[in-house]
């Protein structure tokens, strides 16, 4: 069966369908990771995005039940150059086609992914519609025009947990973390628990519930959408700055910058992949990191808050981390849990978070 991808600027791509027979609208983005497609599919930060993988062969290792980053697939659509129909891995329980079909997500293979990625790189991430059910192009254009886009969208509330729950409860915790969930990945919680920390997760819709007695620090996790749309959580975070150590990852990095009084903005095509170079400005050490975001922190506005940039993305020199000692804030834009991705920052940064929660400067 044929499939079609229409971009808001009129560009058109055709290919073959896999996954669900349906039509979905979203934001067209690309990911440069060579592997880890199952983590990408189930990462809540990809809510309402149609993801194109730059690696040519996808699906080689099949699907397993251990690598999912949440309870469901969050991407709106999945685009690949070549889909593997014979996955091989000792953990595999099935193939990518059936996995997406059972979850109602359309896939498209055989399109010129290189041309698409170069187009998005030059023109920027944009609205799109992907269809595998034969809907007419006129109807697809109508659906595309009705989709509101990402700017101003508070998608974090749609993927957050509904009530507080405990992720890790050791007998003698090294530190007690309250985590704000606006789409946090399972591996962040797992690895934070591996440091010996007590971890209690709270919905980002009710951040005040996290700021209770007995908590040593707050971690604000990753998530989808426009950070500037989360005015309620930003205000709640502002009220706790300076009272408790607060650390942030990805969306949490952006929300903490807003809470300090800085501004955020939409990146042209974002940073999505497991090969993103970041320099630690304190040591000069360069780490290859995993990233997934479409918004960044505006440098001049952050500097005006008194925060100090600790990490810089070497591809475009955007801010990848900052600290504000006076407000007890430490945040990074990248994903230290590295799922998928390299482990350059994995143990170092998570243990820095724990030490920061214990009152030791990062």
Say what each PLM segment does:
Residues 1-9, 14:
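Acidic, glycine-enriched active-site microenvironments
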Residues 198-204:
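Short hydrophobic/Thr-rich beta-strand motif most characteristic of the beta2 strand and flanking loop
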Residues 7, 30, 52-53, 80, ...:
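General beta-strand structural signal in soluble alpha/beta enzymes
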Residues 219-229:
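Short glycine/threonine-rich loop/turn motifs
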Residues 22-31:
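A short, polar/charged loop-to-alpha-helix boundary motif
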């Amino acid at each position: 069966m044929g499939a079609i991808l229409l971009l808001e600027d009129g560009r058109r791509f055709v290919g073959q369908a896999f996954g669900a027979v349906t039509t979905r609208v979203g934001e067209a983005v690309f990911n440069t990771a060579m592997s880890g497609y199952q983590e990408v599919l189930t990462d809540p930060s990809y809510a309402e995005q149609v993801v194109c993988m730059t690696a040519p062969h996808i699906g080689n290792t099949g699907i397993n039940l251990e690598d999912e980053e949440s309870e469901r697939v969050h991407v709106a659509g999945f685009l690949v150059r070549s889909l593997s129909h014979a996955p091989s891995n000792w953990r595999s329980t099935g193939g990518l086609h059936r996995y997406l079909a059972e979850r109602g997500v359309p896939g498209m293979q055989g399109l010129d992914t290189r041309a698409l990625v170069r187009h998005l790189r030059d023109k920027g991430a944009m609205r799109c519609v992907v269809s595998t059910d034969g809907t007419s192009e006129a109807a697809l254009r109508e659906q595309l025009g009705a989709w509101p886009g990402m700017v101003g969208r508070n998608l974090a509330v749609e993927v957050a947990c509904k009530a507080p729950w405990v992720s890790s409860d050791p007998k003698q915790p090294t530190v007690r973390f309250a985590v704000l969930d606006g789409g946090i990945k399972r591996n962040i919680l797992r690895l934070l628990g591996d440091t010996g920390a007590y971890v209690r997760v709270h919905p980002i819709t009710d951040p005040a519930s996290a700021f209770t007695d007995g908590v040593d620090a707050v971690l604000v996790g990753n998530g989808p959408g426009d950070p500037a749309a989360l005015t309620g959580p930003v205000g709640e975070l502002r009220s706790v700055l300076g009272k408790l150590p607060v650390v942030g990852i990805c969306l949490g990095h952006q929300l903490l910058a807003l809470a300090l009084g800085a501004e955020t903005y939409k990146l042209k095509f974002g940073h999505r992949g497991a090969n993103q170079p970041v320099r630690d400005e304190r040591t000069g050490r360069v780490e290859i990191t995993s990233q997934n975001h479409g918004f960044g922190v505006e440098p001049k506005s952050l500097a005006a808050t008194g925060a100090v940039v600790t990490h810089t993305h070497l591809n475009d020199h955007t801010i990848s981390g900052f600290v504000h000692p006076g407000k007890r804030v430490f945040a990074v834009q990248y994903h230290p849990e590295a799922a998928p991705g390299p482990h350059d920052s994995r143990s170092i940064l998570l243990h820095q978070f724990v030490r920061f929660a214990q009152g030791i400067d990062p």
